C-alpha cells in the first residue's frame, strides 16, 4: 500500500516557487475559463433566438435538484483529494468507487422525485425534464476523481482544454437540436453531451487508473471526515442558490425564471477569471503553505486585494450597463434578464470576494466554518427575497445581492477570528476598490440612463456605445484606484507581464502534471 507522503510535490513546488505556480496557474486557468465563458456566451447568443424564456425556465426548473444532488455524488471527495497529503493512490481508488456508487444512487433518487418537482411547479413538462436529467449525477460522478487529481497536480489542462471543449459540445448540440424544433429537450440533450465529453477528456488527460484493490472502508471514512464539512457548506449554498428558482418558478412562472437564468449568467461574465483562480488555483496553493502562518497570511491578503480590485469593479459595472448590454446582445425579449443582471451586480462582486475567504478556510483545515457562512447568507438572502417578491424578478435579484453582502461581512469576521487575519488589513484591501467602483457607478448610471441610452439604439451602434461606456468606466475606476493606492497600476502591469511570460510555451515552468511518487508509479504500471 502506498503510504509515501507527497513530499515530492511540495518540494517541486517550493523549488520553482509557489508564487510562480499560482501566477502561471491564474493565467492559464483564467484564460481557459474565460475561453469557456466566451464559448458559452456565443452559444447563448444563438440559443436566445432559438429558445423562448419559458423553455429556458422549464429547463432551469427541471434541473433544480441536480446541482444539490451532485454534492452527495461527490461527497466532498474532490476537496478531500486535493487536500490529501499522504496515501494518495489509496484515497483516489476509494473515492473512485464511492463516487460512482453515490452517483448511481442519487440518479435513482432524482428519478423518483421528478413527479414531485412537476407538481411543485405545476407543469408536466418540467416533471418530464426532471426525469430526463436524473442520470446526469451518474455521468458527473464518473469524472470527480480525475478532476480532483488534475487540480491537485496544478495541471491546468482541465481549464484550458476540458472545459472549453465541453462547452463547445453543449453549444453545437444545443444549437443544432433547438434549430430543429426540440426546444427544452434540445437543451437537455446538449447538457448530457457536455458532461459526457468533459468526463471522457478528464480521464484521458489525467493518465491515471484506479487500483481498486487499494480501496478501503477506513480510507473512505478519512475522506468523509474532511469532506463532510464541504458537503454541509456546499449543501447550504446550493439550497440558497435554488431559492430564487423556487420562488420565481412557483409564484411568477417559467418565463421570469428563464430571464433569471440568463441574467445570472450575464452578471457573472466579467468575473470568469476570478472563479478559475479562487476555486482551482488558490485552494491547492494555500493548502501547501497553511502551516507557515506569516507566509500564509501575507499571501491571502495580497490575493484578497487583487480579488477585490477585479471583482468589485467587474461586478458593479453591470449596474449601469447590464440592461443595455443584454437587450442589444440577446434581443428585446430578454430585456428583463438585463434588469436581473443589474440587480445581481452587487451579488457577483460580494460573492467572489468572499469566495477567497472560503478557499482560505478550506486550506486552513476549517471547512466547517464555511457552513456557517453559507447559513448566514441563506437566512439573510432568503428573507430579503421573500420580502421583495412583490417586486418580481428584480426584487428577488436584489434579495440575492443582499444575502451575498451579508455573507461577505460575516466571512471577514470569521477569517479574523479563526485564521487570525488582521481585520483592519482585510478592510484596507477592499476599501479603495469599493470607493472607486461607487464613483464609477455614480458617473456611468446617469450617463447611460439620461444621455447615451445605448439600449434604444440599433444593435451595432448600441454595442459600440456600451463598449465605449465600459472603457470610460474602467478608466474612471483605474484612475481613482491609482489616486487612492499609488502603485496599483504598476503592480498590475507587472503581474500581467509575469502571467504572459509564464504562460508562453518556452516559459520557465512546464505544464506537465506533478505527481506524487505513488501516482507516478501507478501511471507507469497502469
Pin down the residues of each PLM region.
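Transmembrane helical elements of multi-pass membrane transporters/channels
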Residues: 25-40, 166, 187-194, 198, ...
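Helix-loop junctions and terminal segments of transmembrane helices
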Residues: 72-89, 151-152, 263, 267-311, ...
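Membrane-interface junctions at transmembrane-helix termini in multi-pass inner-membrane proteins
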Residues: 80-89, 139-163, 185, 206, ...
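Interhelical loop/hinge segments that connect adjacent transmembrane helices in multipass membrane
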Residues: 2-18, 22, 157, 200-242, ...
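Alpha-helical transmembrane segments of multi-pass membrane transport and lipid-handling proteins
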Residues: 2-10, 97-122, 128-132, 172-176, ...
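Hydrophobic alpha-helical transmembrane segments
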Residues: 127-134, 162-208, 222, 226, ...
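Membrane-proximal transmembrane or re-entrant/amphipathic helices at the cytosolic face
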Residues: 1-12, 16, 416-417, 421-426, ...
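Signature of the first transmembrane helix
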Residues: 2-7, 17-75, 98-114, 131, ...
